[in-house]
């Protein structure tokens, strides 16, 4: 079978899919078809009949706009992606959305489209592979042994996140990571030399990568030799620089930006079919080409061989094998619920007035002993975020058995790498930075929410309570923006008990990211009944109450809860009927049934004050237009925290004053 014709099947399906949708990007799939054919048919270990086989190679299309490439590959290889699915490219509720989306079609390892994040996810997958191998492989038993392959274009390399990720990949010596640069010299605006003239091979050599330059991306033998050389280099990641022609096969549009992001048109597709010698109708693939592409039997054989290896491992190391299966399945330890409930009860029984960032570290200490799957990290702020605990061990190029990654000052890279670790499986990953600097990482957290993957972020120094560092470091609008992100769970605890509950729920939440927001300054622990402790998980609960119906409700989060309690005590002493609601997680509260929400915030009680050292406007949903909000309406200032809280109205006196005005 002629390899060019096998690659032309990808080109034809890509042209046809984009044309039928009247939307899409045919250029990259047509340009990378030869590379994809060699990789997928001669090297990629995968099983179309079990896309979740734990030791499969991972393939990431970082230049996700070229999605017809991966859809064509999955269809031709025998995954459950039909020709009708390809005909439904970019249509509502299809398995083939405009950019590849995790969870839609089997075999899609990650959602890509925002350029640079796919290569970064791939770095995370390669870290996970290296760490799992170091933790579980034994002499003569390599049960974790797979490659991560990634296709990326000029756009990925222009994005700053590619520097963050590829720099760290070199430092960590990710020898099982192999990236293909689609060096076609074209972007949306035209020829890239006017805005992208880097010496990319030297750039990657400087990162510590193994670089294979100047590979003809349309020569199957050259591509194959490059992949063999890349696989043989086990101590460094490899960049294969493939020179390609965008839109290869299109006689009048190849090599130009005209074929990047628009259908070729019926006349040009007809001309391309003639140029390529492709004599078949749109979406028609002859049986001999299907047969040559079909990977089902080979994939099943590869997985069966691995099953035999794993059976031998399980016989020699039964405890490790059981633990590996538990972790890859994403199951928590059997004693999890009992142990964590006891930890939380003990915290309530032994009050401590500590910063919630310290409470977070204590939770890591307690829960970490139960979770060998923890994979922590921080963007060069471990002593401030307090993300290391006594069991933390640094993961390095020389020893990947560690459970803590020093990400350096790479917030965006860290967050997207964690997405890759989560997608790979076998770990409960978390990262950390100051809340203000989640701004650098926002799109990766959005991607975690979109993909519904577990990415736990610890965001400390959560308000003007940061003090002297000033408004560049003081978050204002960040908490609200996290809360408004669909499928994100955001927690701002008020003491060590709420902090531990937030951590417990984040660890249990496998289908979404969590943002855990902690203070720099010490916070008073609140007394609670067992019922109140249980209600923390509901996101909002009655912390202090009056006899009968309240005339005023104070709603507060985090460091402002003790302020609400102090105001409650003063107002109660003056005979006012006041309730305090602690609301560490608005999204968790919003998910409760109507009866519970009414019990906490009765509709009849319209006099409400929300108190939070974050943007004020967020709270109208809970206080109504008749309520009041003590919050931020501007950026902060540089001064000691106590002075700032006073300046911006976060004092008992101001809360009491506002309450009395509302009750008057």
Curated annotation (Swiss-Prot):
One of its GO terms (biological process) is pentose-phosphate shunt. InterPro entries: THDP-binding (IPR029061), Transketo_C/PFOR_II (IPR009014), Transketolase-like_C_2 (IPR055152), Transketolase-like_Pyr-bd (IPR005475), Transketolase_bac-like (IPR005478), Transketolase_BS (IPR020826), Transketolase_CS (IPR049557), Transketolase_fam (IPR033247). It holds the Pfam family Transket_pyr. Its cofactor is Mg(2+); Ca(2+); Mn(2+); Co(2+). Keywords: Calcium, Magnesium, Metal-binding, Thiamine pyrophosphate, Transferase. Thiamine diphosphate binds at residues 65, 113-115, 155, 184, 260, 437. The active site is at 411 (proton donor). One of its GO terms (cellular component) is cytosol. Gene3D superfamilies: 3.40.50.920, 3.40.50.970. Binds 1 Mg(2+) ion per subunit. Can also utilize other divalent metal cations, such as Ca(2+), Mn(2+) and Co(2+). The record marks 25, 260 as: Important for catalytic activity. Substrate binds at residues 25, 260, 357, 384, 461, 469, 520. It catalyses: D-sedoheptulose 7-phosphate + D-glyceraldehyde 3-phosphate = aldehydo-D-ribose 5-phosphate + D-xylulose 5-phosphate. Its EC number is 2.2.1.1. Mg(2+) binds at residues 154, 184, 186. The keyword rRNA-binding does not apply. SUPFAM superfamilies: Thiamin diphosphate-binding fold (THDP-binding), TK C-terminal domain-like. GO terms for molecular function: metal ion binding; transketolase activity. Catalyzes the transfer of a two-carbon ketol group from a ketose donor to an aldose acceptor, via a covalent intermediate with the cofactor thiamine pyrophosphate. Belongs to the transketolase family. Homodimer. This is Transketolase 2. It comes from Vibrio cholerae serotype O1 (strain ATCC 39315 / El Tor Inaba N16961).
């Amino acid at each position: 079978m002629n390899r060019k014709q096998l690659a032309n099947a990808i080109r034809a399906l890509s042209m046809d899919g984009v044309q039928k949708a009247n939307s899409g990007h045919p250029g990259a799939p047509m340009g990378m078809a030869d590379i994809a054919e060699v990789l997928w048919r001669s090297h990629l270990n995968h099983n179309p009949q079990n896309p979740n086989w734990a030791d499969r190679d991972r393939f990431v299309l970082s230049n996700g706009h070229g999605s017809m490439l991966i859809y064509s590959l999955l269809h031709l290889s025998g995954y459950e992606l039909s020709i009708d699915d390809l005909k439904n490219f970019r249509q509502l509720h299809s398995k083939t959305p405009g950019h590849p989306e995790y969870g839609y079609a089997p075999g899609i390892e990650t959602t890509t489209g925002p350029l640079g994040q796919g290569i970064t996810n791939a770095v995370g997958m390669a870290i996970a592979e290296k760490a799992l191998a170091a933790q579980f492989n034994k002499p003569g038993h390599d049960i974790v042994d797979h490659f991560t392959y990634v296709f990326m274009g000029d756009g990925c390399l222009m994005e700053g996140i590619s520097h963050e990720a590829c720099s760290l990949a070199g430092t960590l010596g990710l020898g099982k990571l192999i990236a293909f640069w689609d060096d076609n010299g074209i972007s949306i605006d035209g020829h890239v030399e006017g805005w992208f003239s880097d010496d990319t091979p030297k750039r990657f050599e400087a990162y510590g990568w193994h670089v294979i330059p100047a590979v003809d991306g349309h020569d199957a033998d050259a591509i194959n030799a490059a992949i063999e050389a890349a696989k043989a280099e086990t101590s460094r990641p490899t960049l294969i620089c493939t020179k390609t022609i965008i839109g290869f096969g299109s006689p009048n549009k190849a090599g130009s930006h005209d074929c990047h992001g628009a259908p070729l048109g019926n006349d040009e597709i007809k001309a391309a079919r003639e140029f390529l010698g492709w004599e078949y109708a749109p979406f028609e693939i002859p049986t001999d080409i299907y047969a040559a592409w079909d990977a089902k039997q080979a994939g099943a054989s590869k997985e069966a061989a691995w099953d035999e290896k794993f059976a031998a491992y399980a016989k020699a190391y039964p405890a490790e094998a059981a633990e590996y299966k538990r972790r890859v399945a994403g199951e928590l330890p059997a004693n999890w619920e009992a142990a964590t409930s006891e930890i939380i009860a003990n915290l309530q029984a032994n009050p401590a007035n500590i910063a919630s960032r310290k409470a977070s570290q204590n939770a890591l200490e307690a829960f970490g002993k139960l979770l060998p799957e923890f994979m922590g990290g921080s963007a060069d702020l471990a002593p401030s975020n307090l993300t290391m605990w006594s069991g933390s061990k640094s993961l390095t190029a020389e020893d990947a058995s560690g459970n803590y990654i020093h990400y350096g000052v790479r917030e965006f890279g860290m967050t997207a790498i964690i997405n890759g670790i989560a997608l790979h499986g076998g770990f409960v990953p978390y990262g950390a930075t100051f809340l203000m600097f989640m701004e650098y990482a926002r799109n990766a957290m959005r991607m975690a929410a979109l993909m519904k993957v577990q990415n736990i972020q610890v965001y400390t120094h959560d308000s003007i309570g940061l003090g002297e560092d000033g408004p560049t470091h003081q978050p204002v609008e960040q908490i609200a923006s996290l809360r408004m992100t669909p499928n994100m769970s955001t927690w701002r605890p008020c003491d060590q008990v709420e902090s531990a509950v937030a951590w417990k729920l984040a660890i249990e939440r496998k289908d979404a990211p969590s943002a855990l927001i902690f203070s720099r300054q010490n916070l008073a622990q609140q007394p609670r009944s067992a019922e109140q402790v249980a209600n923390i998980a509901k996101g909002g609960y009655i912390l202090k109450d009056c006899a009968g119906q309240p005339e005023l409700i104070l709603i507060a989060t985090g460091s402002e809860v003790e302020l609400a309690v102090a105001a409650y005590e003063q107002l109660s002493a003056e005979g006012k009927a006041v309730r305090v609601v602690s609301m560490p997680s608005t999204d968790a509260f919003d998910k409760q049934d109507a009866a519970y929400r009414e019990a906490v915030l009765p509709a009849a009680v319209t006099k409400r004050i929300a108190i939070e050292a974050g943007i004020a406007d967020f709270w109208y949903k809970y206080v109504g237009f008749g309520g009041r909000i003590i919050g931020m309406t501007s950026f902060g200032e540089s001064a000691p925290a106590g002075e700032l809280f006073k300046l911006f109205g976060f004092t008992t006196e101001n809360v009491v004053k506002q309450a009395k005005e509302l009750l008057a």
